[in-house]
Design a protein with these regions (language model features):
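Catalytic core of pol beta-like nucleotidyltransferases
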Residues: 2-3, 11-17, 33-122
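Conserved loop-to-beta-strand segment in the C-terminal subdomain of adenylate-forming
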Residues: 20-21
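Short hydrophobic/aromatic beta-strand micro-patches
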Residues: 24-26
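Structural beta->alpha junctions
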Residues: 28-30
Length: 122
């Protein structure tokens, strides 16, 4: 494990009694997808035991969409970092890809709204 973040309702101070514990983990790029999957299962088991809860949702940052990656790092609740330089590199890559995606999503939404305003919903 290289990085771990708390995200979701608990990271935003909005968690309740029924909230799950959302944790995003970044694993080494040298691991295969299958190895990352095995590591995820192992980490979930260890976290459930450590936290004495089965309400643990562990997401592998390596394998999720740019939007979810951004949502994981946005609250900036870092639980673990092996290497501060790697953290900076990973977060910069996530932000770059997310901002590129967001730019095009915003343009598509503007175009869609313009068409709706011009032609209506039919």
């Amino acid at each position: 494990m290289e990085l771990a973040y708390l995200f979701g309702s608990l990271a935003e101070g909005k968690g309740g009694a029924l909230s799950d514990i959302d944790i995003g983990v970044y694993l080494s790029d040298t691991l295969t997808k299958a190895d990352r999957g095995r590591k995820r299962i192992e980490l979930i088991g260890r976290l459930m035991s450590l936290l004495r809860s089965d309400r643990v949702d562990l997401v592998l940052i390596n394998d999720v969409s740019p939007v979810l990656k951004f949502e994981i790092i946005r609250p900036n609740v870092l639980l673990f970092e092996r290497d501060p330089d790697l953290k900076v590199d990973v977060e910069q890559r996530i932000m770059s890809v997310y901002l590129d995606w967001k730019y095009y999503e915003d343009r598509m939404n503007q175009h869609l709204l313009k068409r709706i305003m011009e032609k209506g919903l039919t």
